[in-house]
Amino acid sequence: MDVKILDARLRDQLPHYATPGAAGLDLRACIDAPITLAPGETRLVPTGMAIHLADPGYAALILPRSGLGHKHGIVLGNLVGLIDSDYQGQLMVSAWNRSEQSFELVPLERLAQLVIVPVVQARFNIVEAFETTARGEGGFGSTGRQ
């Protein structure tokens, strides 16, 4: 799969999988100067990367980095970013400071992660009824807590 890099600043810090079992790779803030996110503020941050998956059997997800969310309250403004296989533009991260403290985002800081996932496009058929299952229409805790 070919991932194109738009920003030459990433040349020395190419995205990579940190371990053999890593599902995601880090996206960095490709900014020229630090950005301060005030409490409650949301800002679009460029990553310097463009992606064109081309294969409709794949999509990419932009997910938050757990450390930024837990330690600093920095999460994604849209919670999850979905990148369709036919998108060709630069990846942008919607950074949301949900904490009560300002947060300074510095150039090339790791801000989010990218995961490439398989996609199945469903067909829909109108039916008179579903086959009966043990669960039936039970939802929201219907199978118990333990």
UniProtKB/Swiss-Prot annotation:
Substrate binds at residues 65-67, 78, 82-84, 92. One of its GO terms (molecular function) is magnesium ion binding. Its EC number is 3.6.1.23. It comes from the Bacteria. One of its GO terms (biological process) is dUTP catabolic process. It catalyses: dUTP + H2O = dUMP + diphosphate + H(+). It holds the Pfam family dUTPase. Its cofactor is Mg(2+). Pathway: Pyrimidine metabolism; dUMP biosynthesis; dUMP from dCTP (dUTP route): step 2/2. It is an enzyme of class 3 (hydrolase). HAMAP family: dUTPase_bact. This enzyme is involved in nucleotide metabolism: it produces dUMP, the immediate precursor of thymidine nucleotides and it decreases the intracellular concentration of dUTP so that uracil cannot be incorporated into DNA. Belongs to the dUTPase family. This is Deoxyuridine 5'-triphosphate nucleotidohydrolase. It comes from Thiobacillus denitrificans (strain ATCC 25259 / T1). The lineage of its organism: Bacteria, Pseudomonadati, Pseudomonadota, Betaproteobacteria, Nitrosomonadales.
